[in-house]
Amino acid sequence: MKKLLITIGLLIACQWLAAQNLPLIKPIDDYSFAHFERNHLLYPGDSTAMERFFQKLDSVVFLGEGNVNIMHIGGSHVQAGVFTQQFRDNLLNIGTDLIGGQNFVFPFSAGGTNNPSHFMVSSTGGWGYTRNAVRKDTDKRMGLAGAAITTTDPKATVSIMSRARRPNLLTPEFNFNKVTLIGFSETENVEPVVSYKGKTLHGHYDDYQSTYTFEFPDFTDSICIFFESMPGDFTLQGVLLENGMSGISVHGVGVNGASVPSYLRCDDFERDLNLIHPDLIIFGIGINDAAEANFEKETFKRNYDDLIRIIHRVNPDCALLFMSNNDSYKRVKGKKKRVRYEVNTNGSIVEQACLEMGKKYNAAVWDQLERRGPFTAWSGKNSRSSRRISS
């Protein structure tokens, strides 16, 4: 099915192309209810940070020099990876040989939940799963991924393949020759190892970063993580795949049900963020915050203040882009405690908060509520309307 609207990846690409006086690279379908004339990045404050980001993008695209790291952070829509993968595909096709040197991933399916779409995972043995959106889980240390898997099973393995489940003609292929496993053993006696072409490799351990780094003589698209012995436990917090090449890297960080406070509960978020040192962060967190019965704009903004403070400690020059919420539904309890769904009117409050934060932090804003209109306008225009989801 054709996309209802261009993705933010194409939006960024088009804005960048406009600055180069180049034509659009992808046609846009015409829908009467969509406000295409409003489909652009807003700058309520100063645009200097984004201009600096675009200059760095110029160096990568035109000179083949340097790296650009972009992180898209959110909830279930980012964990699913569909939006982020389309963003990645569009952005990496504005030129040639642009696929960057890093790919931060987390093997969600080993914990019994869904993986993003741009890589594949298989696992064996028993793994316990914790995520930042569940308060009772936050006694387990989590990092940038917002999730963790833990095992005491000597037969436990996790295999990761850096290939999209449903690739299209634009989907780039990512190969790597370096792997960094982020994790720890609470019993301090379990070490993860990696299988590479039939050989067992031991990594270099960094106690400060809590990482195990493995380097390969050749490029590959897959690894298997396992344990030679299991006298205790091991918790995996994330995996960084690298190839040392210049280009554009797009990292998706998303957990089902996550809100801004969910990421603030991750003790090792800042530590792990240093590994990718983002140049641009796209904030897609807000749907789950706005679904809370006691949602307040000022609290929402203060939570973002805390998160941005962490980000700017890692990279003070990191550009920020806020995505406002779509129209959405929220669960409410009616008579006799029956659950029903109603339109969440907090979307417009999140929209205003994004504009205010855009001004405060000199950030860009992509106003989805403004450009696509209310749910009643686009409902029934695509095959997902029965689920109240726009494509």
Which ranges hold each PLM region?
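Conserved SGNH/GDSL esterase-like catalytic core that processes O-acyl groups on lipids
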Residues: Q79-S195, H204-R302
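Loop/turn elements at helix/coil->beta-strand transitions in domains of secreted/extracellular proteins
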Residues: G66-N69, S246-S249, I276-I281, N315-L320, ...
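Alpha-helical scaffolding within the catalytic cores
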Residues: G45-V60, Y263-L275, R302-I310, I349-Q352, ...
